[in-house]
Amino acid sequence: MEQKRCISSLTLEQLSAELKALGQPGFRAKQIFHWVHQKLVSVFSAMTDQPKTLRARLEEQFYIAAPQIERRQEAKDGTVKYLLRMADGNCIETVVMRYHYGNTVCVSTQVGCRMGCRFCASTQAGRVRNLEAGEICSEIYTAQKDIGERISHIVLMGIGEPLDNFDEVMRFLENITSPEGVNIGMRNISLSTCGLVPKIDLLAEKKLQLTLSVSLHAPNNEIRSGMMPVNDAYPVEQLMQAVRRYQNTTGRRVSFEYSMVRGVNDSDACAKQLADLIRGMGAHVNLIPINPVDGSPYSATDAANVRRFQQKLESLGVNATVRRRLGSEISAACGQLRRDEMNGKA
């Protein structure tokens, strides 16, 4: 028996081709796309304006991505963290963060991660598989239905390296920004990368109006390679050249993520090196007090030291902010909920 495919992963153009092959009129594609990506149904039987025969055929060949909420944690500030179980039984994490300008969802792009960053819980068991475009969409739809409020912003900063799943992430972006779907503005989307240089160049060619957020975390190769194995393949100099090419091609400002680790990357010397590295780029730096991760040798810099580091950067002409810590009383470290579930603790 042929394995069912995820209809949520098809772009409108791809869906049109599939329906044409089934002998359906052209207008059916938009109708079905609306049901999946705008009305957010999870079963074909809910598509009441479609012929029963077509619904039956779709049921035979496709499924709609609709993960189950395995675990839900809500913090006092309204942050909600989900452990979602996908159709194949694998689990991922999704987080809703509430801000004055709207609701932001942090989505995962892979089941696990193979980048090996030593301060991150989501990479400790490696990568199991890539998520399909429709599965990434379903994280947003599940969260939106659960909280009963519109999602206005997306950050691709959950489990996985988005550019290591390039094609599916591009299809996800096409579907999630489609006027025929939930129509989230591309400028309201941030994509994070640990620094896959060839994929940054590939992304630049797309000239998308999203915000690229580079997980830098260190101002030199010695420290960065100790924290992030990807730096051995794409050292700081190559990464920064790619980021500058990206800026020149897209005209978009880039932000840098910098996780503050006690005694590793939080010195005044590091602040000066960081300022020298990004000077003239008009870039923004997000300073992140790391969350404790079981099995990691790293610990967070104290708040006073984070503030001092920020002030040092600003005195050197760098725009830097300290990331607001949302949901601090829930399992906040990225990948921690999934790892607990894998270890039988959830």
Task: Specify the residue positions occupied by each region the protein language model found.
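Auxiliary Fe-S-binding modules of radical SAM enzymes
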Residues: 1-92, 244-253, 258-346
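Short linear Ser/Thr-Pro motifs
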Residues: 75, 108-109, 122, 192, ...
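Canonical Radical SAM [4Fe-4S] cluster-binding loop centered on the CxxxCxxC motif
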Residues: 98-135
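Generic beta-strand structural signal
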Residues: 80, 92, 103-107, 115, ...
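Conserved alpha-helical substructure of the radical SAM core
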Residues: 124-153
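Conserved AdoMet/S-adenosylmethionine-binding subsite of the radical SAM
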Residues: 144-320
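P-loop NTP-binding catalytic core
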Residues: 88-102
